[in-house]
């Protein structure tokens, strides 16, 4: 009987632990050349640094699961915390990408801006897959691949799509 109780308690503890959200990890992302880096820490917030001198260039509020920094050290893009998965009850107002310049957000790209037709979305078991953010290239363009396979390049200095 004692063994049965021990097994039951062990299983219930492991089930409870498995259903808990993941802890917020610290996140470090280098620019294409490695000159600058973005650091997002759950306790200290997010900041952009000169990688050689370890000098903070600017900061932004909060923690961000996914962020991309340009070589100029002035521009950064944050991605929706759900990454490439959207809830099935999504709102067209949900922000997929936020463009920042030296600590100030200057443009949001929302679901309605990037996914004009929800038919583009791919259904998973519990969510919708909307696309993949590949990162910022040496020319300061954020490459985003939508779920339908169409590629977009966003000029990070203006937060709008540009020609390849």
Where do the protein language model's features map onto the residues?
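Structural core positions within WD40/WD-like beta-propeller blades
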Residues: 36-39, 75-78, 143
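Blade-terminus and WD-like Trp-Asp/Gly-His loop motifs, strongest in beta-propeller folds
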Residues: 27-35, 67-74, 131-140
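Short coil/turn segments at the loop-to-beta-strand junctions that recur within blades
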Residues: 61-66, 113-116
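Surface-exposed loop and turn segments in beta-propeller and other repeat-based domains
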Residues: 107-127
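Beta-propeller blade signature
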Residues: 92-103
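Short, solvent-exposed loop/turn segments at conserved positions within beta-propeller repeat blades
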Residues: 40-43, 87-93
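Short glycine/acidic-enriched loop and turn motifs that connect beta-strands
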Residues: 82-87, 149-150
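Terminal domain-start segments
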Residues: 17-60
């Amino acid at each position: 009987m004692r063994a049965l109780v021990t097994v039951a308690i062990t299983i219930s503890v492991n089930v409870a632990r498995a259903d808990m959200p993941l802890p917020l990890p610290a996140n470090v992302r280098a620019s294409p050349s490695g000159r600058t880096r973005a650091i997002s820490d759950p306790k200290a917030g997010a900041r952009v640094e000169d990688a050689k001198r370890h000098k903070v260039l600017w900061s932004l509020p909060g923690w961000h699961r996914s962020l991309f920094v340009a070589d100029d050290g002035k521009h950064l893009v944050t991605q929706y915390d759900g990454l490439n998965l959207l809830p099935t009850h999504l709102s067209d107002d949900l922000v997929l990408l936020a463009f920042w310049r030296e600590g100030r957000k200057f443009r949001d790209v929302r679901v309605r801006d990037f996914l004009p037709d929800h038919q583009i979305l791919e259904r998973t078991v519990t969510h919708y897959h909307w696309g993949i953010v590949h990162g910022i290239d040496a020319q300061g363009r954020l490459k985003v691949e939508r779920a339908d396979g169409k590629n977009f390049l966003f000029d990070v200095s203006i937060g709008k799509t540009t020609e390849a």
